[in-house]
């Protein structure tokens, strides 16, 4: 019974860890901004991105778990040193985004208690560190992610209900959009399963001892659940923002996602949004640190033996940089652009591994999953490549 309970908790915990890692301050801002631009047609973008997210994540999680190896080890088996390259991209991207996550947590406590954002960032960093000071850090991380995810969705759902969004119109344009923005699709897919995010849950399952072909049903369920949890938050926030925008309310350009909360609850709405952005940010801090370090553990035995200390160091560095330097905009933009390449590169390596018996044994990867995976690789590679070329051109102009 204990083993069954442990597996169920691990499967649920992995889903919430991945989902709450995706729901960070950038997730909230992007959702509000695109809703303001595309209005009800943003529902179509969300729907399409959900399908692409599921296609990408199912491929990655199933192959990682059936092989019993972390993504960097699979990559090294496919191409020598490819795992080191992937790990470098993940860690750079994870650190850059974690600086933003710590900043978001600081802003959240500033909205709730009125303390300085820098002090809020330090307090949030300490709270995240406390989890990894305990021996049962994995279980605490799972439970914390579940609690924060529940709080975020419930508060945002309340705000959505109060803004009275045009649900019928949103549902209609989710299938028949008036306009389509390819950049919005790429941004949503990259923000949900890009970078370190999709590997958070897969590596968590491995750490919980869930691996092998016999675990495929659990893994598929956890993988899809993670996408649906993150997407539920996006849909609810989309409708909340659509509710105020459809009434002619202009979004606050400094913090667009906060607008529906203020519309519903006035000044207290800032406190409500503070709770949401803090929960979103601090869980992303934890997810980014945990997953980034998980990409180094098998490449360096010293890190494996002192994993929690390295996770704590990762959080400390992110917090110190935020407090002393702030958000180094140029670095964040550049690393964020590189981060867009992680999904097509990592997914391509994982898909190549699916046909290597020395990696997956006798496992037969479903053809339709492989097809959907390669489709995501091609689309994301093209659009991410265009973004990087545009960035380099603007840098030298």
Curated annotation (Swiss-Prot):
Principal subcellular localisation of the protein: membrane
One of the record's GO molecular function terms: manganese ion transmembrane transporter activity
GO CC, alphabetical: plasma membrane
Transmembrane segments annotated in the record for this chain: 9-29, 38-58, 85-105, 112-132, 148-168, 182-202, 226-246, 271-291, 310-330, 331-351, 365-385
GO biological process, one term: iron ion transmembrane transport
Location of the protein in the cell: Cell membrane
Record's keyword annotation contains Membrane: yes
Signal sequence coordinates: none
Pfam families: Nramp
Membrane topology: Multi-pass membrane protein
InterPro entries, A to Z: NRAMP_fam
Keywords in alphabetical order: Cell membrane, Membrane, Transmembrane, Transmembrane helix
Family: Belongs to the NRAMP family.
Protein name (Swiss-Prot/TrEMBL): Uncharacterized membrane protein HI_1728
The species this protein was found in: Haemophilus influenzae (strain ATCC 51907 / DSM 11121 / KW20 / Rd)
